């Protein structure tokens, strides 16, 4: 299933190598170029939404990021879009939760063992990895625990209709 761009292992590197070989041999590989461009767009999507809808009105929001692994069911953060996002917001109050990523690998932000503690009093919630436990978040409780009302959920982990009914500003990737 689609993620926030090509991440993890070596696929991104391999595609760039194939593209370089194709360019050296004057072979048109627009398809691979399109994949790489789409990946770049997806990797920056959360950042672009955060800039447009949050940072434009609140220069110092508190932000919860749920998920650092590049995909669910792994502890790998290699080339994870979350790391790029963390680098961009390292001067903000950032709360972080991931069920399996080693907290010692995280350079920025404050790691929380529980989802509830992570989301408490934040202005923005970003779900960067669609872990199963994030689907079980009690949205009414979320409404009471958060200070703000912005949800950035590229994977549609949460129930968008209920979030909107509760007064959240909900952003997801695609339609």
Regions found by a protein language model. Give the residues of each.
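Structural/interface elements that position substrates and couple domains in central-metabolism enzymes
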Residues: 1-175
